[in-house]
Amino acid sequence: MAEGGGPEPGEQERRSSGPRPPSARDLQLALAELYEDEVKCKSSKSNRPKATVFKSPRTPPQRFYSSEHEYSGLNIVRPSTGKIVNELFKEAREHGAVPLNEATRASGDDKSKSFTGGGYRLGSSFCKRSEYIYGENQLQDVQILLKLWSNGFSLDDGELRPYNEPTNAQFLESVKRGEIPLELQRLVHGGQVNLDMEDHQDQEYIKPRLRFKAFSGEGQKLGSLTPEIVSTPSSPEEEDKSILNAVVLIDDSVPTTKIQIRLADGSRLIQRFNSTHRILDVRNFIVQSRPEFAALDFILVTSFPNKELTDESLTLLEADILNTVLLQQLK
């Protein structure tokens, strides 16, 4: 300390100069620490589990969270309804489903997309539900409409069936494979099932109004105390009026078969042939029944699996198409 109690010259100089400005080395150390913190932050974010999201313009996907550890988890995203319905149509198309002409649908719904997978010859089975009893040696031809809604599906005018129920999922898996589900096979005794599909995934299930129709011509076998309301199928005269103009000569001494033909416009023809008739006779029958197809080039294919009948000189027996469904496809 200087004489008189004042501060020493060196100490006074340090006080007057204030804090020391940071050097270049101090700045480098600060930047390095900042960079390390940023890297740690990014790495911690990248290690977090990510969810795969299936987007749909119609129905948002449902999310579930599954965790096996206190600090980690997995987001499980359930496919949307649109994905389920679109995959169902895609698989059905690959197994022989063909689009129907919207103008031929009785519903008149311009927004719906209708497909048909053709008919199938089914064996006898026990049936608990109400059914029509046809005359001897007649095949039962059952038409069923599968409607796919945003919240489930329904058969004809039946109740809503949610997609997530195991029995319903199994039903749709059979349709994807081009097979008639077992529960539909039980509806008939040695007949055919024609399954149509309609896309209504933009709408929620609409419960139809019950409409009473008087039955005529056929008996009904009841499987329960309360019979179900079943609509009466249209008569053959109303369904296939043009069939009267086509002449197919039948030899009663030769085995016969029943062929159903799904036409390109969505309508159908059903005709009895001898097993000795040729595929060319089937073509001629189509042209005679529907003269508008006479000038069009078309082929005939089996419904499942899809196979073009190229040799039209073969008999129906040789082509192995007895009691089957044929599809007409325009070239």
UniProtKB/Swiss-Prot annotation:
The modification Phosphoserine is found at residues 56, 66, 231, 234-235. Residues 252-329 form the UBX domain. One of its GO terms (biological process) is proteasome-mediated ubiquitin-dependent protein catabolic process. The modification Phosphothreonine is found at residue 59. Gene3D superfamilies: Phosphatidylinositol 3-kinase Catalytic Subunit, Chain A, domain 1 (3.10.20.90), SEP domain (3.30.420.210). GO terms for cellular component: cytosol; endoplasmic reticulum; Golgi apparatus; nucleus; spindle pole centrosome. Residues 1-26, 40-65 are annotated as: Disordered. InterPro entries: NSFL1C_SEP_dom_sf, SEP_domain, Ubiquitin-like_domsf, UBX_dom. GO terms for molecular function: ubiquitin binding. Belongs to the NSFL1C family. Adapter protein required for Golgi and endoplasmic reticulum biogenesis. Involved in Golgi and endoplasmic reticulum maintenance during interphase and in their reassembly at the end of mitosis. The complex formed with VCP has membrane fusion activity; membrane fusion activity requires USO1-GOLGA2 tethering and BET1L. VCPIP1 is also required, but not its deubiquitinating activity. Together with NSFL1C/p47, regulates the centrosomal levels of kinase AURKA/Aurora A during mitotic progression by promoting AURKA removal from centrosomes in prophase. This is UBX domain-containing protein 2B. It comes from Homo sapiens.
